[in-house]
């Protein structure tokens, strides 16, 4: 009896881990961090705890819902790609119908929380972000154009705006700049990974840029977008949204990103693709942390 109970307990634990994996927790964590920064930058003082709690809960559940829907829609593609073939749906560890119900349930709960406990505008924007990622990007753009990640990246760039609007109820230029920062960051981030995984994408029939236009062209695009990102990152300082701490940090981080992109471009192979991809994650996290540090230092000095 004890052995049977232990086996059942392990089975339940494994099942919950598979549902947890459906939500892409690492991606959701970065989304929540950028949304939190949007919240904290939106006001000079403290954000009301209930707005922060329910705002992040709703945004996080919506992001996890979109991730789970992505698992469901891409299950056949995932099965032929080395990077994704061990996910719960391709391996049969989780039934597609259960995953779909789980994804929809999270989305419904997320919308309910945002409408009832935050504000309608945040709920509407979050809904559009969810549909933009799970439907427009995953179903259409990803499968039809090498510019998929450019236009599809807008949905993934919205979390700072969602956080800002959750607190203020308004759309202003400052959160739109944060959206622009992530929007321009997205192509070099994903294309660096796509260079390394191009054979995977080709096997799955996904028209990622390295598959359709070649590695050399993609490397050049990574460099050009990184230079564009460096320029965009200076705009918050130019419009007096940030101070000198941000300016110095943004320049240092941006030059570091350009260095990685330039090294990738000059390399005769793809050896620097994953280091560039890794730095891109560090860059975005550090940039948003830098925005917070600059914000609170300027508040203390005011």
Swiss-Prot record:
Reactions the enzyme catalyzes: heme b + (2E,6E)-farnesyl diphosphate + H2O = Fe(II)-heme o + diphosphate
EC number: 2.5.1.141
The keyword Mitochondrion is annotated on this UniProt entry: no
One MF annotation (Gene Ontology) recorded for this entry: protoheme IX farnesyltransferase activity
Protein name in UniProt: Protoheme IX farnesyltransferase
Subcellular location: Cell inner membrane
GO annotation, cellular component aspect: plasma membrane
GO biological process per UniProt: heme O biosynthetic process
Keyword tags: Cell inner membrane, Cell membrane, Heme biosynthesis, Membrane, Transferase, Transmembrane, Transmembrane helix
Gene: cyoE
Principal location class: membrane
Pfam family name, one: UbiA
Group of enzyme by EC: transferase
Pathways involved: Porphyrin-containing compound metabolism; heme O biosynthesis; heme O from protoheme: step 1/1
Ranges that cross the membrane: 27-47, 53-73, 100-120, 121-141, 149-169, 175-195, 215-235, 237-257, 273-293
Record lineage: Bacteria, Pseudomonadati, Pseudomonadota, Gammaproteobacteria, Chromatiales
Miscellaneous: Carbon 2 of the heme B porphyrin ring is defined according to the Fischer nomenclature.
Stored InterPro entries: Protohaem_IX_farnesylTrfase, UbiA_prenyltransferase, UbiA_prenylTrfase_CS, UbiA_sf
Membrane topology category: Multi-pass membrane protein
Organism: Thioalkalivibrio sulfidiphilus (strain HL-EbGR7)
Function noted in UniProt: Converts heme B (protoheme IX) to heme O by substitution of the vinyl group on carbon 2 of heme B porphyrin ring with a hydroxyethyl farnesyl side group.
Superkingdom, taxonomy of origin: Bacteria
Similarity comment: family membership: Belongs to the UbiA prenyltransferase family. Protoheme IX farnesyltransferase subfamily.
Keyword Transferase: yes
């Amino acid at each position: 009896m004890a052995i049977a109970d232990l086996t059942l307990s392990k089975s339940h634990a494994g099942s919950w881990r598979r549902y947890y994996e459906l939500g892409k927790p690492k991606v959701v964590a970065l989304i929540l961090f950028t949304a939190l920064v949007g919240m904290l930058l939106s006001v000079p003082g403290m954000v009301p705890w209930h707005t922060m709690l329910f705002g992040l809960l709703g945004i996080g559940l919506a992001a996890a819902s979109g991730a789970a829907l992505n698992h469901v829609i891409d299950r056949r593609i995932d099965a032929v790609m080395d990077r994704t073939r061990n996910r719960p749906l391709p391996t049969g560890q989780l039934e597609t119908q259960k995953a779909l119900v789980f994804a929809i349930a999270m989305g419904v709960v997320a919308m309910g929380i945002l409408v009832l406990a935050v504000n309608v505008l945040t709920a509407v924007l979050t809904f559009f972000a969810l549909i933009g990622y799970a439907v427009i990007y995953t179903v259409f753009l990803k499968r039809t154009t090498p510019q998929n990640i450019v236009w599809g990246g807008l949905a993934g760039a919205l979390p700072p705006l969602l956080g800002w609007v959750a607190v203020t109820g308004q759309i202003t230029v400052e959160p739109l700049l944060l959206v622009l920062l992530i929007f321009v960051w997205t192509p070099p981030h994903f294309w660096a990974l796509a260079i390394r995984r191009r054979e995977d994408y080709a096997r799955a029939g996904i028209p990622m840029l390295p598959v359709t236009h070649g590695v050399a062209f993609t490397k050049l695009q990574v460099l050009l977008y990184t230079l564009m990102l460096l320029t965009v990152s200076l705009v918050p300082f130019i419009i007096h949204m940030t101070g000198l701490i941000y300016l110095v940090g943004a320049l240092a981080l941006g030059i570091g990103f350009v260095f990685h992109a330039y090294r990738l471009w000059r390399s005769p192979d793809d050896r620097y693709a994953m280091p560039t991809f890794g730095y891109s994650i560090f860059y975005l996290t550090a940039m948003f942390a830098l925005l917070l540090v600059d914000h609170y230092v300027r508040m203390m000095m005011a």
